[in-house]
Curated annotation (Swiss-Prot):
Descriptive protein name: Protein-glutamine deamidase Cif
A molecular function (GO) term: toxin activity
Gene: cif
Annotated EC: 3.5.1.44
GO cellular component, one term: extracellular region
Keywords: Host nucleus, Hydrolase, Secreted, Toxin, Virulence
Biased composition (Polar residues): 52-63
Region of interest (Disordered), ranges: 1-68
GO BP, sorted A to Z: symbiont-mediated perturbation of host cell cycle progression; symbiont-mediated suppression of host NF-kappaB cascade
Function of the molecule: Protein-glutamine deamidase effector that inhibits the host cell cycle and other key cellular processes such as the actin network and programmed-cell death. Acts by mediating the side chain deamidation of 'Gln-40' of host NEDD8, converting it to glutamate, thereby abolishing the activity of cullin-RING-based E3 ubiquitin-protein ligase complexes (CRL complexes). Inactivation of CRL complexes prevents ubiquitination and subsequent degradation of the cyclin-dependent kinase inhibitors CDKN1A/p21 and CDKN1B/p27, leading to G1 and G2 cell cycle arrests in host cells.
Naturally occurring in which organism (per UniProt): Burkholderia pseudomallei (strain K96243)
Catalysed conversion reaction: L-glutaminyl-[protein] + H2O = L-glutamyl-[protein] + NH4(+)
Main location: secreted
Active site, per annotation: 156, 211, 231
Annotated InterPro entries: Cif
Length: 328
């Protein structure tokens, strides 16, 4: 079926106009959240964390994944919390080179818990779709050459949606494409309403950039609140391409200025001089912080800016990440 000009293939992640898997076309400003469609692939049963199987790779005899830092009390010092956050994200990214972890993490079934996704069922759905299309060659021809069995490098919407789910879900599925986005609301004023003693993640759908990304706002322990960006980018717009693994490795634990974020996500951004716009984009969203790699001529300053925030429990985030990393 066609959705926003993209062929949707039941049961698996889909391929956008760019030829990238994920069913999303980047760099097209829209009033709808990127990745607004949910696939119809089957998923495992809903519920809490599934029992760990001895067949799951990367686990020790306790059933815990040794790559993940042990889950401990949330009453942590700032330095320790920063270290735990960095280790959790690094272990998650490392696991995505594994077939099962990759398929579970970058699936577009948003109506079930991410930790209820079953990699075997996802693979079976892929195989069925390939068969329905008359074989692998026919499938590739109809989807722009995409290999459905290859490890996925997610476009911005797919990575933002799924990491948002991973961070926020506990007992109830959260669909990032169905949540209420704030529009015509000051980002700076909204952040000021958030409880500084709680963790929040903000999902940003920026039509000016044709881009979707996350802002992680860990609980404040002392001093000014810290913000971190989590993103992938297909490229072709104002910013160059970047894989989510590379971003997490190099800048995922690099705090960004809330003052700069407030400027970037303000209505006044479109009125700022070109050099200021370039500097802000490079500082916040360019992996090298290099203004020469920002092309502001590709901005769509009349595009809509929308965002939504959600509280998360860091220990639950660790558990969810541990599930994905333990799949291998």
């Amino acid at each position: 079926m066609l959705e926003h000009g993209v062929m949707k293939i039941p049961g698996i992640n889909n391929v956008g106009k760019t030829g990238q898997a994920g069913g999303e076309t980047e760099r097209i400003p829209s009033t709808e959240p990127l990745g607004s469609s949910a696939a119809t692939s089957p998923a495992g049963p809903l519920g809490g964390l599934p029992a760990r199987s001895s067949s799951i790779s990367n686990t020790n005899r306790t059933g815990e994944n040794p790559m993940i830092t042990p889950i401990i009390s949330s009453n942590l010092g700032l330095k320790h919390r920063v270290t735990l956050r960095k280790a959790t994200l690094a272990s998650l990214m490392q696991s995505l080179s594994g077939e099962s972890s990759n398929r579970v993490m970058w699936n577009d079934r948003y109506d079930t818990l991410l930790i209820a996704r079953d990699p075997r069922e996802i693979k079976n759905a892929i195989e069925k779709s390939v068969t329905d299309f008359g074989g692998l060659e026919n499938y590739k021809e109809l989807t722009g050459g995409a290999d459905p069995f290859a490890l996925m490098t997610p476009v911005c919407g797919l990575s933002a949606n799924n990491i948002f789910k991973l961070m926020t879900e506990k007992d109830v599925p959260i669909d990032p494409t169905s949540i209420e986005y704030l529009e015509n609301t000051s980002f700076a004023e909204h952040v000021n309403t958030l409880d500084s003693h709680k963790n929040y993640v903000v999902i940003v759908n920026d039509g000016r950039l044709g881009h979707k990304f996350l802002i992680d706002l860990p609980a404040l322990t002392q001093g000014p609140r810290t913000a971190y960006i989590i993103q992938s980018d297909l490229g072709g717009g104002a910013l160059p391409a970047v894989r989510v693994e590379d971003w997490i490795s190099r800048r995922g634990s690099d705090p960004v200025s809330l003052d700069e974020l407030n400027q970037l996500l303000s209505k006044d951004f479109s009125k700022m001089p070109d050099d200021v716009q370039t500097r802000l984009l490079a500082s916040i969203l360019q992996i090298d912080k290099d203004p020469h790699k920002v092309d502001i001529k590709k901005l769509h300053l009349d595009g809509k800016l929308r965002f939504a925030s959600h509280e998360y429990d860091f220990r639950q985030f660790q558990r969810n990440a541990q599930y994905v990393a333990g799949l291998g």
